[in-house]
Amino acid sequence: MPIDAWVREEVEIPEGVEVTVENNVVKVKGPKGELERELKYPGVKIFTEDGKVVVYKEFPRKKDIAIARTFKAHINNMIKGVTEGFTYKLKVVYSHFPVTVKVQGDEVIIENFLGEKNPRRAKILPGVTVKVRGQEITVEGIDKEKVGQTAANIEQATRITKWDRRVFQDGIYIVEKAGKPIKF
């Protein structure tokens, strides 16, 4: 049963950012680059007016309100990405075998992990840059989902199964997500 007559979520467009909406495809241009994303859901309208992006739905149900707020969050992340960008930081941890990490093309190569002869590989998604400085890895880009997925790929490449993780703590771990430190 609808409670409200409509849901209207607004996102301010900052200076230096250009947002266009055509057929539920939102394009955001800013100083760091350009992002494009299709935000499609039945009955949800997205348009720009008075320097704002508006997500609108008439006679919403609970799920419609959730979708409108999700679209608002996606648009906020796109705007933040093209203005500031996103950065994830990872730390290489090892106790006995020194791990070597290097970037080669669109892959991160992890050598000598737990003394293994074959290197482990993690995929770098397009539009994301990875820098390795000693025991710190920095993942940067304008698309929050691609940056987060690349950091997760690197972390998962060194995941240890069959051994007690409390004892064998070797690996690569995310220590900072999009500027916020991780609490362990």
From Swiss-Prot:
UniProt KW NAD keyword: no
Record-level GO BP terms: cytoplasmic translation
GO molecular function: rRNA binding; structural constituent of ribosome
Protein name: Large ribosomal subunit protein uL6
Keywords associated with the record: Ribonucleoprotein, Ribosomal protein, RNA-binding, rRNA-binding
This protein's GO CC annotations: cytosolic large ribosomal subunit
Cross-referenced Pfam families: Ribosomal_L6
Family: Belongs to the universal ribosomal protein uL6 family.
Keyword RNA-binding included in the entry's annotation: yes
Oligomeric and partner information: Part of the 50S ribosomal subunit.
Function recorded in the entry: This protein binds to the 23S rRNA, and is important in its secondary structure. It is located near the subunit interface in the base of the L7/L12 stalk, and near the tRNA binding site of the peptidyltransferase center.
InterPro entries the record matches: Ribosomal_uL6-like, Ribosomal_uL6-like_a/b-dom_sf, Ribosomal_uL6_a/b-dom, Ribosomal_uL6_arc, Ribosomal_uL6_CS2
